[in-house]
Curated annotation (Swiss-Prot):
Species of provenance: Halobacterium salinarum (strain ATCC 700922 / JCM 11081 / NRC-1) (Halobacterium halobium)
Protein name per Swiss-Prot or TrEMBL: Nicotinamide-nucleotide adenylyltransferase
GO biological process, one term: NAD biosynthetic process
Cytoplasm found in the keyword field: yes
Cross-referenced InterPro entries: Cyt_trans-like, NMN_Atrans_arc, Rossmann-like_a/b/a_fold
Keywords noted in UniProt: ATP-binding, Cytoplasm, NAD, Nucleotide-binding, Nucleotidyltransferase, Pyridine nucleotide biosynthesis, Transferase
E.C. designation(s): 2.7.7.1
Family matches, as CDD domains: NMNAT_Archaea (cd02166)
Similarity comment: Belongs to the archaeal NMN adenylyltransferase family.
One Pfam family from the record: CTP_transf_like
SUPFAM superfamilies reported for this sequence: Nucleotidylyl transferase
Pathway of action: Cofactor biosynthesis; NAD(+) biosynthesis; NAD(+) from nicotinamide D-ribonucleotide: step 1/1
Any one GO MF annotation of this record: nicotinamide-nucleotide adenylyltransferase activity
Keyword Lyase: no
Length: 177
């Protein structure tokens, strides 16, 4: 049995993430989905809580025939111990999936096999673009699984993003508008 690990902020979980997991599902028996920056929420860059992102992912992946564990991973300010931190929070895994150069480097240094999954329609299937569309009232629902749009509606996520779009919690330009 092979268990994989795929990390992202998933702000929000979108169709590109879903397609990556669909590909990963052909290679592993189980998947640990790491919810990165788990302690951050209610800001322009990280509007959703870890719990809300767990709901998005769990509901969006319900039709997959894949055992999935969604695990919140808080940020560390010490990259040298990050892989140990991830391992301490997750079920054991044999292979990590990422396209982030730092994540790849850290897992390689820890002797963890890393596979780089294809990225899909990155010009629009990107969290910042989806959050910008939410802030501006443009179409974003077509870029996320229906289950994610339902979760965003349930938590008034668009209203939250529009509220924090002009300035972040520290009064700085959020970059969304």
């Amino acid at each position: 049995m092979t268990r994989g690990f795929y990390i992202g902020r998933f702000q929000p979980f979108h169709t590109g993430h879903r397609r990556v997991i669909e590909q990963i599902a052909t290679e592993v028996d189980e998947l640990v989905v790491g919810i990165g920056s788990a302690g951050d929420s209610h800001s322009a860059r990280n509007p959703f809580t870890a719990g809300e992102r767990i709901m998005m992912i769990t509901k969006a992946l319900v039709e997959f025939n894949l055992v999935t564990y969604a695990v919140p991973i808080e940020d560390l300010e010490r990259n040298a111990v990050w892989v140990s931190h991830v391992r301490s929070m997750c079920p054991k895994f044999e292979v990590a999936y990422s396209n982030n150069p730092l994540v790849i480097r850290l897992f390689n240094e820890a002797a963890v096999e890393v596979r780089q999954p294809p990225m899909y329609d990155r010009d629009v299937l990107e969290g910042a673009e989806i959050r910008r569309r939410m802030a501006d009232g443009d179409d974003w629902e077509s870029l996320v699984p229906d289950a994610v749009a339902d979760v965003v509606a349930e938590i008034d996520g668009v209203e939250r993003i529009q509220h924090v779009a002009d300035t972040d919690a520290n009064g700085h330009d959020s970059g969304l508008r």
